[in-house]
Amino acid sequence: MKRIKDKIFSIALIFIVLFVFNSKVIANGLYIGTSTVDITPELPVALDGQMHLRIAEKIETPLEANIVVIESRSNSEKNEVVIFISCDLVAIPLEIIESVKLEVKKIAPEIDVNNIVMNATHTHTGPVVRFGLYAIPKIGVTQIKDYHTFFSKKTAKAVKEAWDSRKPGSVTWGLGFARIGHNRRATYIDNSAKMYGQTDIPEFQSIEGSEDQNVQTLFFWNQKGDLIATAINVACPSQEVEHKTVINADYWHPLRQKLRKRFNPQLSVLGWIGASGDQSPHLMYGKAADERMRKLREIDRLDEISRRILSAVEDTYEVVQTERQNYVPIIHRIEEVTLPMRIVTNSEYESSKKEILKIETQLKEDPKAIEQLFRRLNSFEGDVIKRYEKQKNNLPIYKTQIHVVKIGDIVICTNPFELFTEYGIAMQARSKALQTFVIQLSGPGTYLPTEKAVKGGHYSAIIQSTLVGPDGGQLLVDETVDFINELF
């Protein structure tokens, strides 16, 4: 009789243990869904990123949007969700964000579209997505609004696919290193600065700012142990082939190819560009030595860049793959930040007026030059005039939305700018998180320079290039760090 009672007790104990274990799974279960979609535009198409109009009639590589849905389920608390969408675009205009959300609502009303976090890889060989920058021909070229519609419908469908594919999974993270970005602003003995300025002249003094050589990676697995997605944070825009007149995803394309060959043909790869408004893959010095090494390896610059990132990711993977976590709590905060806009001075206003007069004179002599001068006339100089008139009534402010996502002991934070690297480093240094992933261009862009850069001048730091100045940059850092540290 005693044996029977002991057996009953043992069986009951097993059921209790299983119940407790299953409750833990339900309470903190991590569910992951992924998808990838081709967002290559129909040709011919105008290209975004340069000051002049370029019309592409050739596709060198496809463009992609990669989606990862992460959900932390709990039977005692509200489920937390974040939907990351990384796009081979120059920026993410507000019109595109709203259009994608609207399309997702139509086909998947169960999805809370406020959880969508989009970012651009900042390729300069992708379609124009921002209105008012170029004199795009009305006939024979893909129109911006048509691409918006095409992109939004395809991306929304891919979001639904990722949402519907959610299954239990695991995640881990790690840190590697590779020199990808190079600070592209040279300073001189007269205290001036220049983007892509010469460094092999006696007047050259130093490279202006910092570089961030961290390669931070998130790895996502399914229950079978297959790697199904990665998120790779590199503080360098994808602009190695930026001057070409073709469709090209830049270094992310060969990197994705290498990663899919190494891990999984269906691997989703989130390309997260870190704070790198003053960075570029272009070398500022040491070009001959770099070229020699590439020739010895028999590869081009795109392969060299992707090779370095792959090496950092693989090295990180080998170290952290045994630390997969299935029960990671997620906190997703969406915050509105109000920043002071940069004030247009009288001298800046007068300078822009003079430049506009020069451009108008050029156009009278050669009306066809509008294709090359439209952006300078309408946006670059023209917006300065509009801002000067507008600020007479009220001090201008810039409102923007940022996302802060805590996953375990790491955090991801976004901003809409081409944010100079020193701001991103400050966020990482002051954050209480084990690792802090900073994602720029989670919005429409414009440079956000440091005070040193503004004093040095030139493109990326002058009034024409910026809506928000260094005081706004410091406030962005302070508020982002506060949001992060409140989660820890």
Give the predicted meaning of each segment.
Residues 1-6:
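N-terminal secretory signal peptides that target proteins for export/translocation
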Residues 7-10, 245:
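A compositional/structural signature marking long, glycine- and acidic/polar-rich segments
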Residues 10-20:
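Bacterial N-terminal signal peptides
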Residues 22-27:
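Sec/Tat signal peptide C-region and signal peptidase I cleavage site
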Residues 28-268, 272-275, 279-304, 310, ...:
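Conserved beta-alpha junction segments in alpha/beta enzyme cores
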